């Protein structure tokens, strides 16, 4: 099992798909990495030679922010917005949608389960 960026890649998948198991690498990024390394995207992970795995490792370590570093940057950006007190920061702080979505009926993912309020007595 190839281990790249601290992640065990699945053996039986194509290397193009297996690289997407690393946080911060999607399909297009994995295709770019494989093209730079000169590795065929259809190669299975267990068929990789040690030299090819080393090339992929060097490209990812040298040119990309992945896993813990990327998570730290993202949380730092959100924290910065919250400290600034800008609109986006306030939305993050309140746990509401940040990008202008309506909240009257939807936004359950951000708001969590409904807090039922008792109806008015007549």
Curated annotation (Swiss-Prot):
Work out whether the entry's keyword set contains Ribosomal protein: yes
The cross-references to Pfam families, in alphabetical order and at most eight, read: Ribosomal_S13
Q: How does it assemble?
A: Part of the 30S ribosomal subunit. Forms a loose heterodimer with protein S19. Forms two bridges to the 50S subunit in the 70S ribosome.
Q: Which PANTHER family match?
A: 30S RIBOSOMAL PROTEIN S13/40S RIBOSOMAL PROTEIN S18, SMALL RIBOSOMAL SUBUNIT PROTEIN US13M
Query: What biological-process terms (Gene Ontology) are attached?
Result: translation
Give the protein's recorded name.
Small ribosomal subunit protein uS13
Any one Gene Ontology cellular component term annotated for this protein = cytosol
Annotated region (Disordered), positions in chain = 94-122
Q: Which family does it belong to?
A: Belongs to the universal ribosomal protein uS13 family.
Cytoplasm recorded as keyword: no
Q: Name one GO molecular function term.
A: rRNA binding
Q: Tell me the function of this protein.
A: Located at the top of the head of the 30S subunit, it contacts several helices of the 16S rRNA. In the 70S ribosome it contacts the 23S rRNA (bridge B1a) and protein L5 of the 50S subunit (bridge B1b), connecting the 2 subunits; these bridges are implicated in subunit movement. Contacts the tRNAs in the A and P-sites.
Ordered alphabetically, the record's keywords are: Ribonucleoprotein, Ribosomal protein, RNA-binding, rRNA-binding, tRNA-binding
């Amino acid at each position: 099992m190839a281990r790249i960026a601290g992640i065990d890649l699945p053996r039986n998948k194509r290397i193009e798909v297996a690289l997407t198991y690393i946080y911060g690498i999607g399909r297009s990024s994995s295709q770019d990495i494989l093209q730079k390394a000169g590795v065929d995207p259809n190669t299975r992970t267990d068929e990789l030679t040690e030299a090819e795995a080393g090339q992929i490792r060097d490209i990812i370590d040298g040119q990309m922010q992945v896993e813990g570093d990327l998570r730290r940057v993202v949380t730092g950006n959100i924290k910065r917005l919250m400290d600034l007190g800008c609109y986006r920061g306030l939305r993050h702080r309140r746990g509401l949608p940040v990008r202008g979505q309506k909240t009257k009926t939807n936004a359950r993912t951000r708001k969590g389960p409904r807090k039922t309020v008792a109806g008015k007595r007549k």
